[in-house]
């Protein structure tokens, strides 16, 4: 097994622990994955999220810094780092990161929501309201997209069932 394969296995073990809220064990496994593959951005991002769940903002920020260095186009890394900065009390850096996440992905509802919460916290109600409106809009768009995709899938399924029934009726 190669280092990357072993790192992937440790990553999967770490994520299994994360899912069941064993954040300490998750961090241990993800750290092993990072040791084996120091460019494993997703392992850094996931370990940072686990640190964030344990209220270890400093460690989380360090991991999200690594992700940003490895993948500067990761809107999620900026968003998560913004959450860590906010948790550490650095609202200015948090706002900068939420803004950067939204520059990278203008449809990133979670970043709008986080920024709205921060705006509300620092007394910028008008900006918070604008961001909540955007979250609402994006939610409606996502629901509509899901419904449309589901309708297309269902139409195709009904067509296939009809063809299958026709074949059965014709004795094929």
Residue ranges and their predicted role:
Residues 1-172:
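Alpha-helical tetratricopeptide repeat
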């Amino acid at each position: 097994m190669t280092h990357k394969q072993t790192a992937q296995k440790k990553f999967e073990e770490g994520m299994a622990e994360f899912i069941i809220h064993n954040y300490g064990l998750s961090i241990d496994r993800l750290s092993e994955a990072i040791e084996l593959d120091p460019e494993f951005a997703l392992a850094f991002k996931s370990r940072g999220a686990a640190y964030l769940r344990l209220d270890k903002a400093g460690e989380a920020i360090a991991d999200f810094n690594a992700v940003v260095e490895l993948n500067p186009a990761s809107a999620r890394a900026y968003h998560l780092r913004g959450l860590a900065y906010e948790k550490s009390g650095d609202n200015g850096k948090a706002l900068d990161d939420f803004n950067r996440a939204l520059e990278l992905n203008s449809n990133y509802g979670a970043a709008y929501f986080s920024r709205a919460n921060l705006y509300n916290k620092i007394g910028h109600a008008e900006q918070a309201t604008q961001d909540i409106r955007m979250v609402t809009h994006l939610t409606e768009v996502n629901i509509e997209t899901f419904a449309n995709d589901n309708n297309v899938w269902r139409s195709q399924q009904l067509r296939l069932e009809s063809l299958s029934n026709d074949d059965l009726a014709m004795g094929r």
